[in-house]
Amino acid sequence: IWVHFGSGNIFRGFIAQLQQRLLNMGLSDKGIIAVDTFDFDIIDKIYTAFDNLTLNVTLNADATVDCEVMAAVAEALKADAHQPNQIARLKQIFAAPGLQLISFTITEKGYALHRPDGSLIPAAAADMEKGPSGCVHAMGIVAELLYHRYKTCAAPLAVVSMDNCSHNGEKLLSSIREVVNAWLEKRLVGKDFLDYLTESGKVSFPWSMIDKITPRPSEAVQKRLEEMGITGMEPIITSKHTYIAPFVNAEKPQYLVIEDNFPNGRPPLEKAGVYFGSREVVNKSEAMKVTT
């Protein structure tokens, strides 16, 4: 029911925790499928190597720590055009009418199709030239998967940016639409696909506000875990220069406000502490965050 793009610390330390709470409360029996479009070492060395489990270390104000094993990730996949089996599995998932939402923590630059001078990023340009097959840019990959969903079942779906940038849903929609319009101009897809994404009411791009600090893995936390008898927690540096560990350390405060626009339903995430409301509520929450 839920696919998340961006397998880094904000996902592991916050988003996956939300689904874990629902699992703990018996309000869901489903996990999240984690997908990475950029740093595939994370999937191999942090997810697969640890059976998709993460140790979440919460740093409390009184200097104590709370440790919890997160087991909400049911599957971890690489959106890698050079690994056809991974793409085939993703397309199988996107063809399922029961998929309710796909979400993102890929950073604001993950949505960018253009360089600062306005020219297209080469990966984005290549995707827009060749159409919905073998895409490599995150936005091309998602557009390709959405096209597969449209062709197979055309079921509703919420496409939810959870990245820390204002009007994030608008940014995500704009990038997807630009890719699809390029395909449409070359007659690689029909206008019916664009209408499905933007006019049918079947696909939504809700806005959200997120507030959570997940710093890089702390050596002090790792040492503390070792003193508790928890070993094998050494951080790694991936080939894409991500510094990441089998554990996530973060302070306790966290907020997520999402525009409640889910045409295929959604998990009861309000029970896990997520706030839902109108787009106006999201905007006001964003203003509150940046001005207080």
Predicted regions and their residues:
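Substrate/ligand-engaging "lid" and interaction regions
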Residues: 1-292
